[in-house]
């Protein structure tokens, strides 16, 4: 009963340090989901206004929102993964770069949750291609969230 009324552990877990690869993966996944939800749904509420609830119930519109949601989400996961590993490599001297593994784990999980095969494959191929050419020591300083920002358009 106490945990229900005062979910302290649930709240404080959000502020604990990242101590494992799994913690890092959860951080990237949760932050990317948060960014996607606040930007996409905030934008829609602003543009649609009072008709927001009605539009969400429209089947075609809901399908379009779902496609946009997945595109923005995988882009946010990609940008955040690159940012995190770039920062850790440059500032914290991280030696083992598991960016690709973390990214693929997340999108493979999301594929099971409804991410379309097309978006999954495109995101995977783009990430792998970009990872080959990235300057890991500078990426976090050079407009690291450009792609996910552009995914809104």
Model segments located where?
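Eukaryote-specific, cytoplasm-facing alpha-helical/coiled-coil scaffolding segments in long proteins
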Residues: 63-68, 101-116
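Basic/polar, acidic-poor N-terminal "presequence/leader" segments
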Residues: 1-6, 97-101, 105-109
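Leu/Val/Ala/Ile-rich N-terminal alpha-helices, chiefly Sec-type signal peptides and the beginnings
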Residues: 1-60, 67
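N-terminal interaction modules that seed assembly of large macromolecular complexes
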Residues: 42-94
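Helix-driven interaction modules
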Residues: 109-153
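Short acidic alpha-helical/loop segments enriched in Asp/Glu that coordinate divalent cations
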Residues: 53-56, 89-103, 117-123
């Amino acid at each position: 009963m106490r945990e229900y009324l005062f979910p302290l552990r649930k709240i404080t877990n959000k502020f604990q340090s990242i101590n494992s690869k799994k913690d890092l993966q959860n951080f990237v996944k949760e932050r990317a989901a948060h960014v996607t939800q606040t930007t996409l749904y905030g934008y829609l509420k602003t543009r649609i206004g009072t008709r927001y609830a009605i539009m969400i119930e429209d089947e075609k519109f809901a399908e379009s929102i779902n496609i946009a949601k997945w595109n923005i989400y995988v882009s946010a996961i990609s940008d955040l993964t690159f940012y995190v590993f770039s920062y850790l490599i440059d500032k914290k001297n991280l030696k083992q770069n598991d960016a690709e593994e973390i990214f693929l784990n997340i999108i493979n999980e999301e594929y099971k949750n409804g991410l379309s095969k097309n978006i999954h494959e495109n995101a995977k191929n783009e990430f792998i291609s970009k990872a080959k050419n990235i300057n890991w020591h500078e990426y976090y300083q050079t407009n690291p969230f450009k792609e996910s920002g552009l995914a809104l358009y």
